[in-house]
Amino acid sequence: MDAPWRPTASLENLRRRAALLSAVRRFFAERQVLEVETPVLIGASASDPNLESLSLPYAGPGAPPTGRLWLQTSPEFAMKRLLAAGSGCIYQICRAFRA
């Protein structure tokens, strides 16, 4: 009988995923491309009318006047800001959220 707490991914798949991520990171590191991590929660929703953003209530430090933060639909804007600030070549492995 399977316990409901058990992971759904097999150990073999977890190893394959780890190896793939390692290979991707090695590829970019060999080419002097910097890995970055941009915020997942942002103060405004996506400007693309074809994307529906997901928001969450937030009342912590630096909370926006709306009291809500949005889950990023794409890291593109934050990455472009880094490029404009002179970061040089960058890449990111991340999650994006769309309703």
What positions do the PLM features span?
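Class II aminoacyl-tRNA synthetase-like tRNA-binding/catalytic domains
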Residues: 1-99
